[in-house]
Amino acid sequence: MSQNVDEKVVHDDASVIRSVDRSESDSYPDSVSPEGAEPSEEEMKTLRRVARRVPLACWLVAIVELAERFSYYGLSTPFQNYMQYTKTDHPRGVLGLNQSGATALSYFWQFWCYVTPIFGAWVADTYLGKYNTISIFCVLYIIGILILFVTSLPSMSQNTSLGGFITAVIVIGIGTGGVKSNVSPLIADQVPKEKPSIKVLKSGERVIEDPNLTIQNVFMFFYLMINIGSLSVIATTELESRVDFWAAYLLPLCFFVIALLALFLGKKVYHKVPVGDKVIAKSFKCSFLALTKLNYDAARPSLNPDKEFPWTDKFVDEVQRALYACKVFLIYPIYWLVYGQMTNNFVSSAGQMELHGLPNDILQAIDSITIIIFIPICESIVYPFIRRFTPFRAITKIFWGFMFGAAAMVYAAVLQHFIYKAGPCYDSPNDCPGFKNIPNHIHVALQTPAYFLIAISEILASITGLEYAYTKAPVSMKSFIMSIFLVQNAFGSALGIALSPVSKDPKMVWTYTGLAVSCFIAGWVFWFLFKHYNDREDKWNDLDYEQDDGYNGELEPVVSLTRSFKDMS
């Protein structure tokens, strides 16, 4: 009797399988993979892709970044006024370096903050690991903010404030370099390393859970936290305007303690990738050998067994993939030069307009608010909609990021033209006889579209760049390759320093126009050079699954934002 039952069950199961095969054979000519299985080649081409849930450990890392960015943007946003004006000017300042001098020093600040990640990444990937490096550099960060706070007190002389400011900028820059190069790889490290798999939705639709989309969503979420933190500009600019600069710098100093607290609480929760054995030196040796022989096969142990190379064939493939990514980053300095206008020349332009009681540097919050609103929209609506028709690959996103950046500069040039057309000072705002410190008659709200366009360009170019740097780097070099991406911002700032002599009235229309043309051309050059990388994306990503790195990928997922907050409380 039991044998007959077993035979019936087997027969019924076979019937079900045949039924599924018949019902889906038109869409999927190959065999249908069961839920949880790795998709077939045909399914990879035809099924829609979705992301997995964001692991809980990512939230603690995100809190570290939120607190650090709260402090970074909160203290740096008042910098332009602090440097440009004196205590008797309107807007109020301290150092009195004028617009071109303040813009040059502002670009040095950005340059320094984005060249130091190279050092921070080297320390992490070679000696201390990401977690320990972040912890140590956070202490340096706090020391720098403390110096800035003390030397901005009203009792300090202008020379003392200038010396303290330069010292603080150097120390904070070292601190942010150690944090910035490691915190984004650390948050992505918390995502389990799993192959794509089949999932059946409640609607019955069969989809592919794609780990690369999960990484994409993690970086979108990461960037969301950055911009929530950057809303500190609202508080610090108000404190600067209504109290003084010392109050604006005291708030970031106090808030940074949250970053240290999140690091401490997550110490036993974070997945920490082991430090590689001189992995950066190995990668340079491998690359040098391949370049001198004009072929990466010359560095493969399997093809050169007599050489006894201290790496594997997979490592050679990973280094080659990373170099492709680094080539993509070479066009980014033009984009970062455009992006940098938001923190200096846009602020100066706002100071030439009627503010109606607002601080001239508060409008930077529009950029953050736009990103906070549009990241969830892009993640849940725009990107999935586009993926229904065509893969929306990284190179395509970055190209459109350049185009939106160029559009922002076009708008800024047109707006500056109308600022110069408005009285009473026309092309010498705030600085004509009889109208000293009187802005031209044009409303500051007209700057809003420029910040909006910059924000959309960030979602497309900046977030995708972070994702590209992480996914194309070898396992033990995530921080170093991330620092290569970040250092492009430093090169953009160096271009800004060279441009600063013309960043003054009445030349700003041509400054913005030149930036618009440069960004537009750079975007198209980028597209023609790298558009074929889109076709290699899946092949490069598959390299991560060729062998196990020892990480079992067991992390608790976040089911929803609400539940994750409850779990943390």
From Swiss-Prot:
Q: Which reaction does it catalyse?
A: a dipeptide(out) + H(+)(out) = a dipeptide(in) + H(+)(in); an L-amino acid tripeptide(out) + H(+)(out) = an L-amino acid tripeptide(in) + H(+)(in)
Q: Which residues cross the membrane?
A: 54-74, 104-124, 134-154, 159-179, 215-235, 245-265, 322-342, 366-386, 398-418, 444-464, 479-499, 510-530
An example GO BP is:
oligopeptide transport
Disrupted-gene phenotype = Leads to a marked reduction in the transport capabilities of di/tripeptides. Results in increased resistance toward the peptide-nucleoside drug nikkomycin Z as well as the glucosamine-6-phosphate synthase inhibitor, L-norvalyl-N3-(4-methoxyfumaroyl)-L-2,3-diaminopropionoic acid (Nva-FMDP).
- Which SUPFAM superfamilies does the record match to this protein? MFS general substrate transporter
Instruction: Report if keyword Membrane is assigned.
Output: yes
Q: Which UniProt keywords apply?
A: Cell membrane, Glycoprotein, Membrane, Peptide transport, Protein transport, Transmembrane, Transmembrane helix, Transport
Instruction: Give one GO term, molecular function aspect.
Output: transmembrane transporter activity
Bilayer topology term: Multi-pass membrane protein
The places in or outside the cell where this protein is found are: Cell membrane
Alphabetical list of InterPro entries matching this protein: MFS_trans_sf, POT_fam, PTR2_symporter_CS
Where do Basic and acidic residues bias regions lie? Answer: 1-25
Q: Which residues are glycosylated?
A: N98, N212
The organism's superkingdom is given as: Eukaryota
Name a single GO cellular component: plasma membrane
Keyword Lipid metabolism included in the entry's annotation: no
Disordered: annotated span:
1-43
Family assignment from sequence similarity: Belongs to the major facilitator superfamily. Proton-dependent oligopeptide transporter (POT/PTR) (TC 2.A.17) family.
What does the UniProt function comment say about this protein?
Answer: Peptide transporter that exploits the inwardly directed proton motive force to facilitate the cellular uptake of di/tripeptides. Shows strong uptake specificity towards the dipeptides Tyr-Phe and Leu-Gly and the tripeptide Phe-Gly-Gly, when compared to PTR_A and PTR_B. Also able to import peptide-based antifungals such as the peptide-nucleoside drug nikkomycin Z as well as the glucosamine-6-phosphate synthase inhibitor, L-norvalyl-N3-(4-methoxyfumaroyl)-L-2,3-diaminopropionoic acid (Nva-FMDP).
Q: Specify the protein name.
A: Peptide transporter PTR_C
Q: Which gene encodes it?
A: PTR_C
